[in-house]
Amino acid sequence: MADFSVFCVLLSGVSLFIYSPPPHLIFSQTITGHAYPEFVKIVEVGPRDGLQNEKEIVPTGVKIQLIDMLSGTGLSVIEATSFVSSKWVPQMADHTDVLRGIQKASNVQYPVLTPNLQGFQDAVAAGATEVAVFGSASETFSKKNINCSVDESMLRFEEVINAAKKRQIPVRGYVSCALGCPHEGHIEPSKVAEVAKRLYEMGCYEISLGDTIGIGTPGSMLKMLQRVMKDVPINALAVHCHDTYGQALPNILTALQMGVSVVDSAVAGLGGCPYAQGSSGNVSTEDVLYMLHGMGIETGVNIAKVIEAGSFICSALSRKTNSKVAQARSTACCDASL
């Protein structure tokens, strides 16, 4: 059980949450008085989660070039593709060609999503060295997203994880709808904790808690993490925020204050969810990096190169970037040329 003290004090009528961080994490102090991680690992999910909902099929070569560009930014984890049925997610039908076509950097992991044992076997045959399973804290969302109940999904994931253990392949776990569901609305933190705990105990080395529809606030993020951290160690947790309500960065900041040091994001803010209509993209990698670097938190990632990769994929998709940082820098460059 993961536990550390969290208590509330009143200072001039303002409530402040103060906590004692776990000893295995190294923190740096900031001017806010909160303790933050000195280093944050960014998990780039743009090539998979960011592109899976595109209506027009993105050429395989474009996907490969995007991943190759991201591999040169300093990112240590890039989620490459998803080994799901092309019937359910046509955009990912070229998963084998993508995984085999990218120039794999020695210092980068390229996990792929594998919803079941067949997907895992196909991924391994294509050269996957890390996989991920995608669960949900919502029964309704689970049935619409992966066509089975939460309990049934756990049986599938157990097969995948056991097979991965035999091959010494690490498995990452996702819990969607951690802060709300498009069908059920509010999701109790205890339900999120239950699913996260089951995935962790099965053998997932890291559990990413997803605000699938971007409805969370710092308050709901705080309550959810406090509950989940009773069952899963803080160093095994990550957050995955969508920016539908413009709350992604505040939510990430709250997670950092709680001790989370792994953040999922997507280049250019790509994304959405095919089973959560109306949800906007993931928080942009560029914006997360700008915030973290401005706080003195190291990531090892070159923001300029990420912006370049974002410009490439947005040009390929004929759309404007969702990254506020990229937009601002583009405007500044245009103004400077006048």
Where are these regions (language model features)?
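Catalytic cores and adjacent flexible loops of soluble metabolic enzymes
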Residues: 2-8, 17-338
